[in-house]
């Protein structure tokens, strides 16, 4: 009795011993067309059981040695004219022409539950690209990983490299092939070349063949264009699936064209990609911080700390907040300070100020040093009884905070403090105004002087131009004289050279004649 649900190829795979050397590892069981017509399989929503458990099934098989998937590596191009004498020592290849083969169905395919196992690679090594294509000839001696990536592997991925250790680029290729781009999260594959004139669900067929490489987020099939889109939960699974399914076939013998999908125009998908990119960036930063030395971490934390105001007076010894009067938006800046703080004096007269503003009495309301508001105040004096009373209350509270009793001071002492306070905070206002006016006058005088100097400079420039013209004429005359002298010197030097050459020739001729005479004399002597 056949079940209504079609079994996938992974369900029927049984692990084989590592000594077996089969090149093709594709196994699939399909139901008969009668069973398909009788039982219509509903569209699957979410992950199937096999796709979710493939990582757990693989984990139980990683203790065995990985088997060799093939005995030789089939190249995608044919070599021609390689029997030449020139050899490239950089690439370790002979020079010659290479012609690419036409696209054809791959002879091998990776079977995870048959081929996975332990190799000589450590846990931080890259994944084997030939293992993904189903044609690794090294097996257990391979220095790369022979398994599919897990979510833990995706966390340690680098943005600039893929899981196979290949360098990624800033932008995608024009044909959307290759290793992909690090500017975006490549998790969606484009599958072209699907046959649509078949019975059964295309989505189930695509899911069955692609869920072997990792957990799938969604599968979308566009029937009228014979294409499909598969989106994985992790980038590592998508990169592995792209290599594993390139030039492969589905259940109907079609040749698949696997590429990276372009950016999705769906706003929801864009938000999801932004969140994933933010998550990946956060994980990379946290990983970088964990890899730092303790000294570097402490230095980084010191840079991240900020300066905060002292709030000790706002809390008692038990750490409970003290009930203080609410602060006002009117603030003063003390001389020499770098922060604005609420002035206690402004808090007390603020209510009276608001009443005056509401009643329209704003003639004498003006900002104090550009910060806060003050009214009816002339520098160096206290011209209202209300202000004197408020000032006394403020000083009493101010000194009470530091442990002093302001009420015990005499009137002369209070007057001295008041004068000191006024001179310290407001005493330099008149001096500043005088300095500004004096500076303006000085600037005007300097401008007038500069104009006169400019006129004098123009006259001097005219005189300088005339002098320059005269100097140029004299220079030209001097240059002509120098040129004439140089020509005369050249002629004299040429004469001297010719005479010296003639003298050397004569000397050489005389030496030759003397030598000939001596040779002839020697010959005569020998004959005698």
Swiss-Prot record:
The gene is cwc2. Coiled coil: none annotated. It comes from the Eukaryota. CDD domains: RRM_cwf2. Involved in pre-mRNA splicing. Binds RNA. GO terms for biological process: mRNA cis splicing, via spliceosome; positive regulation of cell cycle; positive regulation of RNA splicing; spliceosomal snRNP assembly. Residues 1-47, 429-528 are annotated as: Disordered. This is Pre-mRNA-splicing factor cwc2. The C-terminal RRM domain and the zinc finger motif are necessary for RNA-binding. InterPro entries: Cwc2/Slt11, Cwc2_RRM, Nucleotide-bd_a/b_plait_sf, RBD_domain_sf, RRM_dom, Torus, Znf_CCCH. Signal peptide: none annotated. It is found in: Nucleus. It comes from Dictyostelium discoideum (Social amoeba). Keywords: Metal-binding, mRNA processing, mRNA splicing, Nucleus, RNA-binding, Spliceosome, Zinc, Zinc-finger. Associated with the spliceosome. Residues 448-471 have a biased composition (Acidic residues). Residues 187-263 form the RRM domain. Belongs to the RRM CWC2 family. GO terms for cellular component: nucleus; Prp19 complex; spliceosomal complex; U2-type catalytic step 1 spliceosome; U2-type catalytic step 2 spliceosome. The keyword Transcription regulation does not apply. The keyword GTP-binding does not apply. Residues 9-32, 429-447 have a biased composition (Low complexity). A zinc finger (C3H1-type) spans 122-149. GO terms for molecular function: pre-mRNA binding; U6 snRNA binding; zinc ion binding.
